[in-house]
Amino acid sequence: MTDPNPQIRPARPHQKLLDDGRTVREVLTYTRRGSRLDAKQQKAWDAYAAEWVIPDEAVDEPGFSLESWFGRKGPLIVDIGGGVGEATAVLAANRPEANILALEVWRPGVAESLARVGAAGATNVRFCSVDALWTLENLVEPVSVSEVWTFFPDPWHKTRHHKRRLVTPTNARMIAERLAPGGIWRLATDWVEYAEQMVEVLDAEPLLSGGVVERWDERPVTKFERKGLAKDRVITDLLYRR
């Protein structure tokens, strides 16, 4: 673990306070959105959340173990920002031997993902809504991950927001360190300039090698991707290996 004492972890995002009690202003890779569920989402939540969703407060408990939430050993795949689970459900069903940790902060998205994963008959996904970078750094052991999936992360296209992008040198190093030898980081984006930055950042990371690749045929075309294609955006797939 990053912290040498597993009983004590850094405060999670939204919990870091100054001495006067004010919340620390943080640079996050996502925006906060509403958490209210509609009737269909609530039904999925009620059906699956108790078994498949890791409560936020659970990660603060001494001795927290990801493996215990899966109830078995298996190759660990981390899905960062899976949205409503269109890709997560299909890929999880195709990888029944893998333990898939789906990191998504938007609660309605988690609820829709639960419905899709359940409909796909996949029982190997556990959802966590704690900040993905904090989770990777503090809950995921180095050299323990077989794959990381980062499909269509927010491009934060305004220059002043580029600091909020997920793929930065600091984040790339931390994620690369979580990959086992031979582990893979798969990415996709419909924003050409972000794809170029991804290549620049990941090519410069000495733990990784790879680049732009043909579209991964196992990755389903999601509603989000179809919208990008309808706007004539170029979809770029990347693969880097440790």
Annotate each predicted stretch with a short phrase.
Residues G83:
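Conserved glycine-rich SAM-binding loop
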Residues V167-P181:
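A short glycine-rich, Lys/Arg-flanked "PGG" loop and its adjoining helix->strand segment in the class I
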Residues I80, L103:
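Conserved beta-strand/loop positions that form the S-adenosyl-L-methionine
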Residues M198-R242:
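Class I S-adenosyl-L-methionine
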Residues T2-V78, E86-A93, L114-P142:
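S-adenosyl-L-methionine
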Residues P181-T189:
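Conserved beta-strand signature within the Rossmann-like core of class I S-adenosyl-L-methionine
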Residues W106:
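Conserved SAM/SAH-binding beta-strand->alpha-helix loop
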